[in-house]
Amino acid sequence: MRLTLFAFVLAVCALASNATLAPRTDDVLAEQLYMSVVIGEYETAIAKCSEYLKEKKGEVIKEAVKRLIENGKRNTMDFAYQLWTKDGKEIVKSYFPIQFRVIFTEQTVKLINKRDHHALKLIDQQNHNKIAFGDSKDKTSKKVSWKFTPVLENNRVYFKIMSTEDKQYLKLDNTKGSSDDRIIYGDSTADTFKHHWYLEPSMYESDVMFFVYNREYNSVMTLDEDMAANEDREALGHSGEVSGYPQLFAWYIVPY
């Protein structure tokens, strides 16, 4: 009886040892990278990427990025920019959606909202301020072209968003309107948090889009539900909860 019990204990120990030594699956590796990004341990995440590439496991990085975007993690953009500025450009180019590279290289882009498929532009108003609107028809003129300039602070990346035609930056108004939303307009300077925006990636029906938030007010950029006479819609900073609704509040960022 003692011998049988001893053999049983040895068998259990052997199984435990084998489990400890078993190679980590790609799913486990992807989850480890995912969690490092979620909790903001970017140096650890970058080190994991280097390790996975040495092991020829680039698909693990791609899977982790996919999970981050599908779950709408804001840290995704911060992590990608950390890679971009710390000798990880090829990782971003190879394993992140193309939109990240387009934004980081400051290419000219268009912002098109998902809900209405309107392209963002600036238009003149009577008081000579330029107001942001979504254009219902124009998708090709320079009026709908923009450039993102990154600003890195405390491991967070923000962007100044400039109209390439008007050379003005998007800024959120100080004053709330009747619906508690704020007007978005153009400004020749970009020296306050009201001029800074951050991007939260999202995925809807396999499309990569972005919620565009203002740094000062944490309001998300959207278009008015009411149309003007020309079928354009005024751009607003919306203060309500939008998570989980990319089909209503997210934007495509595509090359111009």
Swiss-Prot record:
Pfam families: Lipoprotein_11
InterPro entries in the record: Lipoprotein_11, Lipoprotein_11_N
Subcellular location: Secreted
GO cellular component: extracellular region
Signal sequence extent: 1-19
Keywords: Lipoprotein, Secreted, Signal
Domain of life of the native organism: Eukaryota
Additional remarks: This lipoprotein belongs to the group of structurally related '30 kDa proteins' that comprise major protein components of the fifth (and last) instar larvae and of pupae.
Family: Belongs to the 30 kDa lipoprotein family.
Protein name according to UniProt: Low molecular mass lipoprotein PBMHP-6
Species for this entry: Bombyx mori (Silk moth)
